[in-house]
A protein has these predicted regions:
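Beta-rich nucleic-acid/ligand-interaction surfaces
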Residues: 214-217, 310-317
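Hydrophobic h-region of N-terminal signal peptides that target proteins for export
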Residues: 18-26
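Peripheral terminal and inter-domain segments
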Residues: 26-134
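A mature extracytoplasmic/lumenal domain signature
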Residues: 74, 83, 96, 164-166, ...
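K/E-rich alpha-helical interaction surfaces of small helical-bundle regulatory domains
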Residues: 54-67, 295-299, 306, 311
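N-terminal secretory signal peptides that target proteins for export/translocation
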Residues: 1-9
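Extracytoplasmic cell-surface/polysaccharide-interacting catalytic and binding patches
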Residues: 116-208, 223-305, 314-330
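N-terminal export leaders
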Residues: 10-15
Length: 330
């Protein structure tokens, strides 16, 4: 064998060895650390299967006995009689309901669709001009000075889908010039802790709204028909969003980047939005419970009528805020 051939053989062996080493490094990625006990404690139960074959049957129905729910649980359909204090459940098989006739009720938008729309009763431009010229209601001095911080500055893995920076909201109008989310520092840090625990379980937090300037709350009120005022906060009292101590959010799946399925859409105005709504699928209710557990563990309380809305425990300590996003220190 010639020396040149020997050098070529050695060079080829080095190249092959390097390629094999690179492949080994690519495939032998370190496994993710096991979730901590505090993260595992958030799990409501073992995660149920999606049971998509039942989705078209799950819902609310009218019957001679009143409104009943057809829900999915443990890969079976159940009829839930809400008129009973105990919410009696019956396995949904033909022999179990006898002659009871039920008719499906259409109660809200389909999952993943745009939410309900309310036609503004006044020009949004006029409402905005008046709201910007108005002042929040007077209050006693607050216990704490405002300290608004941006959630994504504290944790860049938190995702934003700020609905009021788009037209996909109940009034179909952009209210924010920028898609940003601020909260008072203790509340923001609590959201970050919840997100970090959830990430250990394969989920992250997706923010729909956080601090909301008071003038936007006044715009909601002035643009909404009187018979729909129950949908929005009264600017005469302000809201916890105005105080920077409330957040609207959901979960997203880290593997897909998509929001998880919940019993209702965001900002839905039906009973499906209630935090303890009994309907839906096992997985929808499990997702809702996981979000609630994560937020409650960090000092938040869920709004009983909105599964996505959480108020921080010290919201009373902060004043109603009216500063726009662009005037908050970056």
């Amino acid at each position: 064998m010639t020396s040149s051939h020997s050098r070529f053989t050695r060079r080829r062996a080095v190249i092959i060895g390097a390629l094999l080493g690179a492949a080994a490094c690519a495939t032998a990625r370190p496994s993710a650390p096991a979730p901590t006990a505090s993260a595992l404690a958030l799990l409501p139960s073992p995660k149920p299967a999606a049971a998509n074959e039942f989705r078209d049957l799950v819902g609310e129905y009218d019957s001679d006995a009143g409104i009943v729910f057809v829900i999915e649980d443990s890969a079976r359909l159940w009829l839930v009689d809400t008129a009973r204090a105990t919410r009696k459940r019956t396995a949904l098989v033909p022999s179990s309901i006898g002659s009871l006739r039920i008719t499906r009720r259409i109660v809200g938008p389909q999952a993943g669709s745009n939410q309900l729309q309310v036609t503004p009763v006044r020009s949004v431009d006029d409402v905005r001009r008046e709201a910007l010229a108005a002042s929040p209601p007077p209050e006693p001095p607050a216990a704490r000075a405002p300290d608004l911080v941006e959630l994504t500055t504290l944790d860049s893995t938190i995702k934003l889908e700020i609905r009021y920076a788009t037209t996909n909201n109940f009034l179909g109008t952009r209210f924010y010039d920028e898609a940003r989310a601020f909260m008072q520092r203790p509340a923001a840090e609590a959201v970050v802790r919840a997100n970090q625990k959830l990430r250990q379980l394969g989920y992250g937090l997706l923010i729909h709204d956080a601090y909301r300037p008071w003038y936007v709350t006044k715009m909601f009120w002035d643009a909404t028909p009187l018979d729909k005022h129950w949908l929005v906060a009264n600017p005469a009292r302000g809201s916890n969003h105005n105080r920077g101590a409330a957040v609207d959010l959901t979960l997203f799946d880290l593997a897909t980047g998509q929001a998880v399925d919940m019993p209702s859409t965001y900002d839905e105005s039906t009973g499906r939005a209630f935090a303890d709504y009994p309907g839906g699928t096992s997985l929808q209710r499990w997702n809702r419970a996981l979000l609630r557990n994560a937020m409650v563990a960090e000092g938040f309380l869920v709004n009983p009528k909105e599964w996505w809305h959480f108020d921080y425990k010290s919201w009373r300590d902060y004043p109603i805020g009216n500063v726009s996003f662009d005037r908050i220190a970056r």
